[in-house]
Amino acid sequence: MSVSPVAIVSTPVAAPESSAAVAVPPVVVRWRGVEPYETSFDAMRAFTDARTADTVDEIWIVEHPPVYTLGQAGDPAHLLVGDSGIPLVKVDRGGQITYHGPGQIVAYLLLDLRRRKLTVRTLVTKIEEAVIETLAAYNLASVRKAGAPGIYVASGVHEGAKIAALGLKIRNGCSYHGLSLNVKMDLRPFLAINPCGYAGLETVDMASLEVAADWNDVARTLVRRLIANLDGESAAADTPHALEHSND
């Protein structure tokens, strides 16, 4: 799920009127378990369409069965095989093609950017920082890369390999879609695509980097870092993180 100035699909919204500062309700975290991609996609759009000015922002933590997703302006030619046996879903986020599957954390960010007084670029930066901080907690150094959206390995044998991807849709000033972080996956499906439109781009997971991380622990760390960057460290400390990972 790549994100860049051209990988963020948005609908125009009027600038908010200036007003006194209003407290922003803390983000609600929901663990949706192992869920078909189409179910999450439909639920995100329904949630966003039904939002009011009082709707509390949410982060959804999900794990998907194998699926390729192609962004709104994506080129199907980036799927390199005719019949991979893995479904392809065309979606309304920005970016090109990516893969989701077991062992990957997917976080969907359903946020009111106007209420939070966030630009899209600032939101992207906060998401990227949360991923970088999460990986740092496991002694993995990672970086952004100019012109190639996502989070990449900073050094070593796999320097430059992609470990996390981002993609957003902004509708009426509210975001959906989000990020994916590879923990311990079967990486072979990435070989059948040009990940996020980049031919030959290596994709890795934390296990490839010799980090035996528990999916639940990484998910909790990621949630804490996302909330800390959005709502502050104190909010992150007070947020329940009772996430349970299942392979069912």
Curated annotation (Swiss-Prot):
Entries under Pfam families matching the protein: LplA-B_cat
Enzymatic reactions: octanoyl-[ACP] + L-lysyl-[protein] = N(6)-octanoyl-L-lysyl-[protein] + holo-[ACP] + H(+)
Residue ranges annotated for the BPL/LPL catalytic domain, each copy included: 53-234
Site (Lowers pKa of active site Cys) residue list: K162
Enzyme class: transferase
Gene Ontology biological process terms, A to Z: protein modification process
Main subcellular location: cytoplasm
Entry-linked InterPro entries: aa-tRNA-synth_II/BPL/LPL, BPL_LPL_catalytic, Octanoyltransferase, Octanoyltransferase_CS
Family: Belongs to the LipB family.
Name of the featured protein: Octanoyltransferase
Gene: lipB
